[in-house]
Amino acid sequence: MNRRRPSAPAPHLETGNRGERRALEHLTGQGLELLECNFRCRAGEIDLIMRDGEVVVFVEVRVRTHPGYGGALASITPAKQRRLARAAARWLQRHRLTQRAVCRFDVVTFDGERPQWLRHAFTAPG
């Protein structure tokens, strides 16, 4: 019988998970409340969904360990922004908040050890 041992997560996934945990710590330390982690749907994925007062905040977390790949913020292309906006719309529909929700898209980047929190990083396209 051939038994497989559980494999360790890929290094880039572990880096991303660690970044999401650190971003969550930072944002909750700033007074935001966690609504959901790693929301997935056909439209895409949202790393963190938070509440900042009455505002629903969709957060993309980016970690860059090597400057040769470009900065963390530069990796959020217009196509990625569209996917995030579509996933956010699905989340709002599922929670019946489409008509009354005030939302924003934030980005937390790690180009080193310290987080950089960019509020209103982009607006939903379309």
From Swiss-Prot:
Pfam families the UniProt entry points to: UPF0102
One MF term in the entry's GO annotations: nucleic acid binding
UniProt xrefs under Gene3D superfamilies: 3.40.1350.10
SUPFAM superfamilies: Restriction endonuclease-like
InterPro entries given in the database record: Restrct_endonuc-II-like, tRNA_endonuc-like_dom_sf, UPF0102_YraN-like
Superkingdom field: Bacteria
UniProt similarity note: Belongs to the UPF0102 family.
Protein name: UPF0102 protein Mlg_2205
The species this protein was found in: Alkalilimnicola ehrlichii (strain ATCC BAA-1101 / DSM 17681 / MLHE-1)
